[in-house]
Amino acid sequence: MLDCLKKITFLSLILSLFFLLGGCRNENDECQQVQDSLAFFIDFENECENSMWKNIRRIENDTAYSGKYVCECTPDMMYAFGINFNVDNSIGKSNASMSVSMMINARTLLNSKFVVSIEKDNKTILWKSFPLSDGFIAENQWYENSFSFNIPNDLLKNSKFNCYILNDSKEYFKIDDFCFNLKYFNLPAYIKNVKEYDIPKDLRNIENSDNINLLYSEKEKQILIADDENNIITKPLSLYYSLIINGDTLEMQNSRFDLTTSSRHFITLLQPCRISASDLYIRTENNNVNFNLETKFNEDVKVLKLSLIIPFLNDDFTIYRRNPFVDSCDYQDVYYLDQEGFSLNFDERQLNLYHPDNVSSIQLDVKNMTAHINMDYYYDHLLMRYELLDTVDYYVDNSSTFVKKNSSIKSSFTMSLTDKTYLPRIMPVYDGYESAFIWTEHADWTDIKTHRATYFGSEDIKNIEDATGGFAYYDIPVTKSVFYNNPDSVTNYEKNPDFPGLHSTIKTDDSFFDFLKQLRDNGFDICLHTPEQYTTTIDNLKEALSFMKENFASPSWIDHGYNNGIISNREDLVCDALDSTSQYYTYDLWKENGVKYLFNASYEEMRPRPFVNYIFENNLMRPYPGFGDALPVPKISRLYSYPDIMLWSTPYTLEPGENWGWNYYLAQERLDKIVDFRYVFITHFYAPWVQEKRGYWETKNGKIVAKDGLNDALQRIALMRDEHLLLPMTVADYMTYQQQIRNLEYRVNEDGSVTLKNNNNETIKGLSLISVKEMSLANAKSFNMRKTKNDEEYIIWFDMKPNEELLILINN
């Protein structure tokens, strides 16, 4: 036993050192930063009585792979050799890469499996099996069997691993040299190490505020943030630039600012350099400091990242995650906060930065106590373009922002110093829901029969009030894209000869048009999937957009057919729609016709797919949020040069196939995960596609009907909607709400209360706030309230009229 444990301990130590030294910290590296590891090895050469090993049947064997002993698995052992161990809180926020390898000698190809079971709170949260047949060479010949997979942090902490060989086929075989590894890792940071500047000695107060003060060094030309008693809160602020100029990447950081204006409540600083000039305007108002930053470039540049770097002197953060959840301890190393924020706690007060007015995103490097306020960031707006070329599947990466000479990028945000409080955060979904499910259908290869089947339940049903199944029956709205017309007389025959007629378009099928109007009148979002199957003409594009505006008034658009060819729908967002020199330039026509919420295929199409390594167990959410918050995945995207549009994306196409697939991929446990992570899941699908395998329909008794699996899944979603957990909604409704909350002014008052002002021209319906403490509205304004699914927070929701101001009170 002692020799066995020595071998285990030695290997664990060696592997731990190896992986600790093998970490990385580059912004865009996809390697995983391993913090520690566990390694267990057994070769069965000694009697090993450690309780973590299970069902060891040790025998001497002259054909052992190594040494003289092996572990025997016999037909009477349903549960053969295995290992049990616990994972406690000491792993922090780390994930784990699990790998197992063993040598196997079998008389035949095995049906047995190695099972990994993880339990938490006396409940099995993961059961996964791996075939022992992998690697088989020949009978009675040793072969290596191995596998590995990543396990997210939300499954690891305080969990129990129960791993074993499941010999349910009653087979005989031997194993030797079994090795089990858990290598802990954090997500890649997507933040480069920035320089920290020492605090200069010659500081003077250039603000003299009763709340937040600004300290300036004349010698070093550096600026810092302090409280009303001049206690320093930050190290010197700096600007970080990552630019592409004439094909070369330039990175620089500068903390020197010239003080150009200094008066009570208003300060102007200038940071000049060869490439740009950055003006920092700072205005104090009560307990708030408003930062306005403008960087003007002296030559054409592509911006990869432009950030104001704020290094703090302590790390007692309250972090308002993008989910939205709150972390106030047990932090991750790095957070991508999207448009959320954080508070820094000290003494009896806190410094707040939440719901910024106009920033691209916020990243918080907790490990280095540094905030990156991104004026612009490549990953906030991934965008590809299929240029017109004599090839296929070739795209250029247009994610970096192109800024012309003498043009500028502007940003603004507010920081406040207040009493300790629990800030109410703005929910990404209205009416008090914790999460949302958005169905977006692409119009390809459809027939009126398959439309009626998947929306009304059967091909025979013509009126929505008679629906027996499908989306309309369960009142699950869809953003449904359509073709306007069919000038090329495209038929469905090539996809399915059972549907030889024209594919569905508005102008070629009056019954289809009537079907769409019924959906429109019941809350469905009907938009263009481009005007036609192939590249359209400018006249047809104008006609289609005008018709859709008049009849459906959808602000949405879903690209179709994108690729490099001349027929590949050049009017697409990811083709020529944003190229003002192209005859297929579409941006101005979108604006004229109220189209502003566009599908961005880049997250599906770019190779390698961003963050593809962080998929887990066929969960709908990709990347899986349980791995952590460092990945820069924004809820929505905006483009600097095209301010009138907002982009949304999908991670993949949802094609469950047979009915069993529906009950697997959209099982209750996977839908529950969407709520648990307060996630907005947007799916790309083809319900009426004329091929039964890909479509959401099947044939019963000679009739086309909605698949049973689809109906079961929609019923589960409908029940979760009725429980006020998961809201089925359209792109139009979701994006409108996102636009409205972007225009919602959020100010934290000195006593910790919050003032909201609706700067929209329309009422925000069902504006939802969440907090760990109960909230109320001043002046006895009515509101709704419920507790979250986990019973740990409160959600309130209410309507807010244009220009209305509301005071939110928190019961601290």
For the regions a protein language model found, what residue spans apply to each?
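C-terminal domain-boundary segment and adjacent tail
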Residues: 429, 635, 653-761
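Active-site beta->alpha N-cap acidic-glycine motif
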Residues: 416-518, 522-525, 530-534, 540-546, ...
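Active-site-adjacent pocket scaffolds in enzyme catalytic domains
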Residues: 250-251, 258-259, 321-346, 350-352, ...
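Acidic, contiguous internal or C-terminal segments within carbohydrate-active enzymes
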Residues: 265-320, 545-554
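Extracellular and organelle-lumenal recognition/adhesion modules and their flexible linkers in secreted
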Residues: 24-202
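C-terminal beta-sandwich/jelly-roll accessory domains of carbohydrate-active enzymes
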Residues: 323-358, 376-390, 741-812
